[in-house]
Regions:
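Conserved catalytic core of nucleotide polymerization and phosphodiester-bond processing enzymes
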Residues: 1-137
Length: 137
């Protein structure tokens, strides 16, 4: 259980705050009035009381970190002058570009997506991609 004595404690790229977990991009996962009772975590939202458990909170953190990684990658791909990012679905970035030098452009995109973020340089990332006239899986 995280208690007030843990506030300010850092766990890798995460920092524990009162009723929240601060993420490496400055955003936070908030759990208002978080408490532990009768073997479960409880917090309050505008909709009422939410009961949850430790693994679900861990899943929230993992999903938030993954979202930060893909968003940062998407912004880097968007900065490439030869492509326009048009869609992002889960762990995919879909971009439009010229057929001219498409292999070179794809290699640039893959290098971006394989580069771990500065806040977790040992994160193992891999990527694959393809060039197509139409969107396909």
């Amino acid at each position: 259980m995280i208690s007030p004595k843990d506030y300010g404690t850092e766990y890798g790229p995460l920092k524990v705050g009162p009723q929240r977990i601060e993420l490496p991009n400055g955003m936070s996962l908030s759990y208002p009035d978080l408490r532990y009772a009768d073997g479960e975590f409880i917090y309050t939202t505008q909709k009422g009381i939410v009961r949850t458990y430790g693994p679900r909170l861990a899943e929230n953190v993992i999903q938030a970190l993954a979202r930060i990684v893909i968003t940062d990658q998407m912004l880097e791909v968007h900065a490439l002058p030869e492509v326009d990012v048009v869609l992002q679905v889960h762990d995919e970035i879909i971009a439009l570009g010229s057929k001219l030098d498409s292999d070179v452009t794809m290699e640039k995109i893959l290098n971006i997506m394989k580069t771990p973020p500065s806040w977790c340089t040992d994160l193992p990332l891999d990527a694959e991609g393809g060039v197509s006239q139409v969107y396909d899986k």
